[in-house]
Amino acid sequence: MSTAGKVIKCKAAVLWEPHKPFSIEDIEVAPPKAHEVRIKMVATGVCRSDDHVVSRSLASPLPAVLGHEGAGIVESVGEGVTSVKPGDKVIPLFTPQCGKCRICKHPEYNLCMKNDLMQPRGTLLDGTSRFTCRGKAIHNFISTSTFSQYTVVDEMAVAKIDGASPLEKVCLIGCGFSTGYGSAVKVAKVTPGSTCAVFGLGGVGLSVIIGCKAAGAARIIAVDINKDKFAKAKELGATECINPLDYSKPIQEVLQEMTDGGVDFSFEVIGRLDTMTSSLLSCHASCGVSVIVGVPPNAQSLSVNPMSLLMGRSWKGAIFGGFKSKDSVPKLVTDFMAKKFPLEPLITHVLPFEKINEAFDLLRAGKSIRTVLTF
């Protein structure tokens, strides 16, 4: 029996309050309105940014259905939708691409002005949500809300992908992989023969390493205080791994000594102010490029001596690896299917959706790279 045009009752993980576990609830998901798409989720990754909402280091309205790194199948579409149809495999996009705003029209930049990242509303574009639970409206999360068996997104926040793609793997392209990989190949524009340093070896940091290797870097130095992550980093392309705790001097000085004055490209993939500074200073003063990839804490400022930049260093940042989402996500899935990069090594755990709190425990304990929840 078709569910198009009807309210769907399903399971979702609702975060009612900060610092609390997710609650598996029976929710109602309303049909998509004009220019909206309802998706039956198949798989979703668990990302550190979701946990930032739990801890309130990232502000977003609650109660909410979180999750933003998923893949699924279109169940129904609202009036006027032309880019996808029921049955299509899709990836929801936490960075939408309206195609009309100043940023979407820019040849390089990607953070569409209709995003829900800068000042989160926790709604779809029309200012409302399609989720209700116990008679109460439940907020969306950054245009996606993948921690639900069904979700509704704006058409500008969904991309059709290869119908043969394995959704339990390519869901990582919805956030973590693309963010890291793009930071290397698109934002920094790593060059063949160059030297790179990557601070932080979670799923995004390892994806930076994959990108540096794909771009032809000659040396990729992985930096983390957890030595258990070194083997995986080397498997994916790191040529050396170092632990800052093994040295009595600042890690930027160690890297400068290792690389004749500093690396060509450095990446901070943790979200700490001190490592952002270390990453900046570890790249060469005259030609280095440092990229902020990790999400920093809310309402904190970074103080840097301007002389650190005056001699020629560049300091950059980008969301979603600088990729224009609707244009790039289908191409990235095609590249994965063509074996141009791996995703499997990033997935350390696959759990049923109902075990979402166990997945977050693994994340917080540093025991997982990416956990994929399946519906």
UniProtKB/Swiss-Prot annotation:
Q: Name one Pfam family in it.
A: ADH_zinc_N
Residues with the N-acetylserine modification: S2
Provide the residue positions that the database annotates as binding Zn(2+) 1: C47, H68, C175
* Gene Ontology BP annotations: retinoic acid metabolic process; retinol metabolic process
Q: How is the cofactor bound?
A: Binds 2 Zn(2+) ions per subunit.
> What EC numbers are recorded for this enzyme?
1.1.1.1
Any one GO MF annotation of this record: zinc ion binding
Give the N6-succinyllysine positions (modified residues): K234, K340
Any Gene Ontology CC annotation = cytosol
Q: Which InterPro entries match?
A: ADH-like_C, ADH-like_N, ADH_Zn_CS, GroES-like_sf, NAD(P)-bd_dom_sf, PKS_ER
What protein name does the entry list? Alcohol dehydrogenase 1
**What is the species of this protein?**
Peromyscus maniculatus
Instruction: Report which gene this protein is encoded by.
Output: ADH1
